[in-house]
Amino acid sequence: AASLQPDEERIEYLRADRWIGYTRARSTLQRLEELFNWPSKQRMPNLLIIGSTNNGKSMIIQKFKRDHLWVAVREHADHELIPVVVVQTPSEPSVSRFYAMLLATLGAPMHPRARIAELEQVTLRLLKSVQAKILVIDELHNVLAGATDVRKEFLNLLRFLGNELRIPIVGVGTKEAYLAVRSDDQLENRFEPLLL
């Protein structure tokens, strides 16, 4: 059908993203689905999706998000629900920048000079309000771009969010993301590595 379209439309069709459900991608989606349906408890399972650059990690996450977005909107038209929240780790992984990225992802206004405690409370309240069931943090390897103390603070933030929200956290990144998580003993045993 696309071959019968005008040149511009065919070119646009060829350049568009395509989902190619190779075996490892399908099994990763299945694992994400298991986490999505996990009942809330004190210590939730987390996942660390590891793969080389241009290996389809972000495409898998976007497909997972799309698969859950329309259901939430259709069933709750009067209240916005965001069951799968996807945020990218900032290039400089400070706690305040991460909260700012999360708030922007949720479409929330933010005071430019808000303190971390304020950002934290607003973010937690919003994530609960939109009934987030899973938090995906893409480009987690960016954590290594920070100085040692900034890196530790960011990794502590991941542990805090997991404890506070009681939802699974999925980290996505290159092997450097695995090295970052392994640098914290408590986080290492909370994140199940999944190699693509």
Residue ranges with predicted function:
Residues 182-196:
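A short helix-turn-beta junction within AAA+ P-loop NTPase domains corresponding to the substrate/partner-engaging
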Residues 1-6, 10, 14, 29, ...:
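Mid-core helix/loop region of P-loop NTP-binding domains shared across ATPases and GTPases
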Residues 1-45:
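A short, basic N-terminal segment
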Residues 41-63:
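Walker A/P-loop nucleotide-binding motif
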Residues 71-90:
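Conserved catalytic segments around the Walker B and adjacent sensor/switch elements
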Residues 66-77, 108-110:
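Post-Walker A helix-loop "phosphate-sensing" segment adjacent to the P-loop in P-loop NTPases
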Residues 87, 91-103:
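Conserved phosphate-binding/catalytic loops and adjacent sensor/switch elements of nucleotide-binding enzymes
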Residues 139, 171-177:
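A short beta-strand-to-loop transition that corresponds to the Sensor-1 phosphate-sensing loop
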